[in-house]
Amino acid sequence: ISSTISGEMKKDAIVAIAVSSVLMLLYIAFRFSDVKFGVSAVLALVHDVLVVFAAYSIGTLSVGNTFIACMLTIVGYSINATIIIFDRIRENMRTQDSKESLEELVNKSIGQTFTRTIYTSLTTFIMVFVLFVMGVTSLKEFTFTLMLGIVCGAYSSVCITGPLWYTMKKKFSKKNA
């Protein structure tokens, strides 16, 4: 961690992350009327942040203001893609065929949003990559981190959030039944 970030700033950043995670969890749980949506979204965001943080650790890059800005951007980008998928799951649940299982519904919902998620991630990645290649040196760290976060966020939105929600829904439904 770079010397520009004081101990107090690190503490404030950790508190801000914890508070924002709880608020996101509550908002998503309220919006989708199911706390499992919120939990799976926040866990996917934790995944994204940890992967990028691991890359920073492996690359021995210093954590500073650029890192914090990238993390906020990645979280915002990733939660947006996750909300799109959750919204489709909710819509499909309203019109669910009685013969269709919940697993099939989640898979269908992810499939319906897959192209949109990939296109959005790919176009954003291309633009950030161009900035990485052609931009000034001071942008390299920001754009590299953002590219990694875009890939990680797309992966977690498509491959983690829906299946994690389904798993929690299935597990907790059995306990309550």
Where are these regions (language model features)?
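A structural signal for conserved, well-ordered secondary-structure elements
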Residues: 1-177
